[in-house]
Amino acid sequence: MPTVDDVLEHVGEFGWFQKQAFLLLCLISASLAPIYVGIVFLGFTPDHHCRSPGVAELSQRCGWSPAEELNYTVPGLGSAGEASFLSQCMKYEVDWNQSTLDCVDPLSSLAANRSHLPLSPCEHGWVYDTPGSSIVTEFNLVCGDAWKVDLFQSCVNLGFFLGSLVVGYIADRFGRKLCLLVTTLVTSLSGVLTAVAPDYTSMLLFRLLQGMVSKGSWVSGYTLITEFVGSGYRRTTAILYQVAFTVGLVGLAGVAYAIPDWRWLQLAVSLPTFLFLLYYWFVPESPRWLLSQKRTTQAVRIMEQIAQKNRKVPPADLKMMCLEEDASERRSPSFADLFRTPSLRKHTLILMYLWFSCAVLYQGLIMHVGATGANLYLDFFYSSLVEFPAAFIILVTIDRIGRIYPIAASNLVAGAACLLMIFIPHELHWLNVTLACLGRMGATIVLQMVCLVNAELYPTFIRNLGMMVCSALCDLGGIFTPFMVFRLMEVWQALPLILFGVLGLSAGAVTLLLPETKGVALPETIEEAENLGRRKSKAKENTIYLQVQTGKSPHT
């Protein structure tokens, strides 16, 4: 009986139907970018200082320039050490409405030295130096409440983590198409609700909900396209589907520049996603899933439609189509199986560390550049562009060099770039951006390639479980990354870079402990997985990119 791949060889492995479905589903991949890293623009923290009653009126009466107003009325400007905290979170305890204040150095009549004047925390809000708005400026998430910005982004990654626990079941139980449509609808609704949230708490809950379903939408699209194409195109299609995410990043920079108000920006990236619901009429259910549910008639009908669109003739035995037999799947996997043998234990722990470290590096560099860049939009745009050559490097090296050395080298490059950024003076901003781009390119390569290696190191019956458990560390890394970046920057701006450098260099070193899987057949049993790297397999190399997983990172 012909398998799905056998039938695809007759009706077209990547014909007009697959190309159309690929382009449509890539739009879903691109739409995840504002959710994944939108914090850079939604949570942008501009220069700010305490609002003091009477200062604006005095400034107008005296005809001060903005720089003179700051110099006369804000403490800590130009000082070292705690200057940033003083100027942004403290104010002089002065009644600026009193008529005795002079227009030239008004505080000189109150104290010979400004440092002797008493200070107090901001009581009347803040003044922000920005033409637009962000969640920071609207909800005053600065000073003592600055950690709430970190929590906003952490909720997205927490949603990714929680969603990955149930999305797989929904997709397997009710179908890939239904999962795609339902998660897309909830993603769109929660995105709009985030934009109109009246307070911080409700905004946080809607953001968490959006994280829980948006990853499911991305994974469902990934699953559908990899199940529609033939095995020879599966790897390239999977990589290009992730490149669509990069297109979303590049586009996000332009949209954010055009719409500086965070609520309108959130609406601009959320409302168009309602159009994805039209996929109900354009994207069919996966024939593989239909066969797994014994719905052969529907699977055959879809294959006939694919053949018609591709102008191919379906095989005569199409109605006898079946799934590939895999006796190993009858064995029930358990978490303990991931640590059952010495090699499996080593592989699992290393893969967990790789997923965690590359997530911290990838998201951390994006946030650090956003917080320290001279031009937020251009820096984000340039650093996003480097993900295109990253995908090209993967396509070129994956079958020529292998997996392990490119992953190790990319980690080492990312780590070294972060450490070098510490020694670059602020005046050489272009060099800092260049190194940040280099580090991000390395992290991108690791994120995409570790997914492939993860699938190739485990035996068949625990391959899905191994991917779900290990890649969950990617979401956990994303939960902690905002706190690592923004809180450590309060201590020393370069401190997160030291952490990134250590993570990258150590990840590169431990990667070399993994066996090379290039040219080696996928292991079917624990014994074969245990012996990976100890012998050369003469079996035909597996050409499938990976088995579709529901626990993988949204960027991988």
Curated annotation (Swiss-Prot):
GO MF annotations in UniProt: (R)-carnitine transmembrane transporter activity; acetylcholine transmembrane transporter activity; dopamine:sodium symporter activity; identical protein binding; monoamine transmembrane transporter activity; neurotransmitter transmembrane transporter activity; norepinephrine:sodium symporter activity; organic anion transmembrane transporter activity
Topology in membrane: Multi-pass membrane protein
GO terms classed as biological process: (R)-carnitine transmembrane transport; acetylcholine transport; cellular detoxification; dopamine transport; epinephrine transport; establishment or maintenance of transmembrane electrochemical gradient; metanephric proximal tubule development; monoamine transport
Regulation of its activity: Phosphorylation of the transporter leads to changes in its substrate affinity, resulting in a regulation of the transport activity. In contrast with rat ortholog, ASP uptake is inhibited by protein kinase A (PKA) and C (PKC) activation. ASP uptake is also endogenously activated by calmodulin, the calmodulin-dependent kinase II and LCK tyrosine kinase. Inhibited by cGMP, most likely through a cGMP-binding protein that interacts with OCT1.
Keywords, alphabetical: Cell membrane, Glycoprotein, Ion transport, Membrane, Phosphoprotein, Transmembrane, Transmembrane helix, Transport
Function: Electrogenic voltage-dependent transporter that mediates the transport of a variety of organic cations such as endogenous bioactive amines, cationic drugs and xenobiotics. Functions as a pH- and Na(+)-independent, bidirectional transporter. Cation cellular uptake or release is driven by the electrochemical potential (i.e. membrane potential and concentration gradient) and substrate selectivity. Hydrophobicity is a major requirement for recognition in polyvalent substrates and inhibitors.
Residues spanned by motif Proline-rich sequence: 284-288
Signal peptide residues on this chain, from the entry's feature table: none
Transmembrane helix is among the record's keywords: yes
Main location: membrane
Triggers of expression: Increased by PPARA and PPARG treatment in both liver and H35 cells.
PTM comment, free text: Phosphorylated.
Family according to the record: Belongs to the major facilitator (TC 2.A.1) superfamily. Organic cation transporter (TC 2.A.1.19) family.
Extracellular compartment residues: 43-150, 199-211, 260-263, 370-377, 425-429, 487-493
Positions annotated as glycosylated: 71
InterPro entries: MFS_dom, MFS_sugar_transport-like, MFS_trans_sf, Orgcat_transp/SVOP, Sugar_transporter_CS
Positions of modified residues (Phosphoserine): 334
Membrane-spanning ranges: 22-42, 151-171, 178-198, 212-231, 239-259, 264-284, 349-369, 378-398, 404-424, 430-452, 466-486, 494-514
Localisation per UniProt entry: Basolateral cell membrane; Apical cell membrane; Lateral cell membrane; Basal cell membrane
Effect of loss of the gene: Knockout mice appeared to be viable, healthy and fertile, and displayed no obvious phenotypic abnormalities. Showed slightly greater body weights after 16 weeks compared to wild-type mice. Reduced hepatic uptake and intestinal excretion of organic cations. Showed reduced thiamine and thiamine vitamers levels in liver and intestine and higher levels of thiamine and vitamers in plasma compared to wild-type mice.
Protein name: Solute carrier family 22 member 1
Reaction equation(s) it catalyzes: 1-methylnicotinamide(out) = 1-methylnicotinamide(in); dopamine(out) = dopamine(in); serotonin(out) = serotonin(in); (R)-adrenaline(out) = (R)-adrenaline(in)
